[in-house]
């Protein structure tokens, strides 16, 4: 089967690689550098499994800048373009998704479009009405950055949308896509759910908001423990050995961040509109409170250090270990709060060659020099290369994992 994938981020590329084991896949992107890398068997993103599969597996995959040619020949078109949260309108910016829909429909009269981008509840219904077609369906993704292909190979569940009154072809394509994902997975007995588009859209937003809730819960627990000088590690262990709670997603941090959780929680809150709620709003608020608390704690520790020059060293901007993504990283908001207090910030981030022009921080990518300059070293996730300056480190990473 010929499949086109719009977007080569961790969602699009991981799906493209997965499906190219048994199908002919064309990745569409607007960046020549990404297209060149994929066509040379290199991954433009950091993902161990994607890198290995591109290098070592027999894949039928190519990348192109020629979107119309790719869409014209495709039987299925997967849309995995960004839907960033627009704080001005308090809603996802879906213009990239809509642009692809319009382009595909203009050159292809038979392909079914499968949206993998995270979208607002009701978006598929809106697009079907706008473009007067039922050939647009939704399949939420449940992937972790840097482990996206692994999560596609070992999925927790597969969800594809379909409506009762859809045409036989669209129904068949929805089932076909679910089967493609299931047959490519290495995990056996993966649950497959076919449901309405709005329900599938809700699953995605509520699932990520629950994960954000867990992060916020254990962060608030940690805030209490640190404030009362209690052992946060022991409290969390004592709670998490309860099977109903579990020993996962319980490691304190500076706040939830990354590409998905911040925007998905805000979008779900916006979707509530006039529907009664308090919990969803509290999750978003809790994350902001946590980042403010962390900044205050850093300032308190800094003031205790007897030094005429106060320098905060930020070790890594990435949100998670083994990630190459700084988007919506909680530490960036903490940095902004510290800078508003006229505190000098130096940053160690080997994935950057320079900071943005308006950033008043200083990039110091010589690790030993960084360690010497900083009075306190702040890190969301601890790394063993800080072991020799452990007395300088402030982190709430209790379990040394994400």
From Swiss-Prot:
Short name of one Pfam family: UDPG_MGDP_dh_C
Functional note: Catalyzes the formation of UDP-glucuronic acid which is required for capsular hyaluronic acid synthesis.
Pathway involvement of the protein, from the record: Nucleotide-sugar biosynthesis; UDP-alpha-D-glucuronate biosynthesis; UDP-alpha-D-glucuronate from UDP-alpha-D-glucose: step 1/1
Binding residues for NAD(+): 2-19, 29, 34, 83, 118, 145, 259, 263, 327
GO MF term set: NAD binding; UDP-glucose 6-dehydrogenase activity
Alphabetic keyword roster: Capsule biogenesis/degradation, NAD, Oxidoreductase
Catalysed reactions, as listed in the record: UDP-alpha-D-glucose + 2 NAD(+) + H2O = UDP-alpha-D-glucuronate + 2 NADH + 3 H(+)
EC number per UniProt: 1.1.1.22
Protein name, per record: UDP-glucose 6-dehydrogenase
Domain of life: Bacteria
GO aspect biological process, one term: UDP-glucuronate biosynthetic process
Active site residues per record: 260 (nucleophile)
Record organism: Streptococcus pyogenes serotype M1
Presence of the UniProt keyword NAD in the record: yes
Family the UniProt entry places it in: Belongs to the UDP-glucose/GDP-mannose dehydrogenase family.
SUPFAM superfamilies the record matches: 6-phosphogluconate dehydrogenase C-terminal domain-like, NAD(P)-binding Rossmann-fold domains, UDP-glucose/GDP-mannose dehydrogenase C-terminal domain
Residues at which substrate binds: 141-145, 204, 208, 249-253, 257, 320
